């Protein structure tokens, strides 16, 4: 007797929790060029020139400000050391900063430690 009620009740509960896919559809907004620049620098990408943007409305000034802010976060000795230690390449976004040679040395130290750890395992 109880089994007759459980299956329909379960079906009713599951169907009542269904989400309408159009309710949470993303809205198209304009590109935040500051964030794009910051993400490029943090990911280690080289700075993009105007030809790299497919959007004719790209705000180069905001992109460059965001890129510079991303470089401040990325181009630090601890961060580059950790990248080397984890086997990642030296971030191209740090190639043109004032202390690039120092950062590259620190990154190389981490990369060397990573390589020796791999050989030991």
Swiss-Prot record:
Pfam families, sorted: DUF2799
PROSITE patterns linked to this entry: PROKAR_LIPOPROTEIN
Protein name stated in the entry: Uncharacterized protein YfiL
NCBIfam families noted in UniProt: PRK11443.1
Domain of life the protein comes from: Bacteria
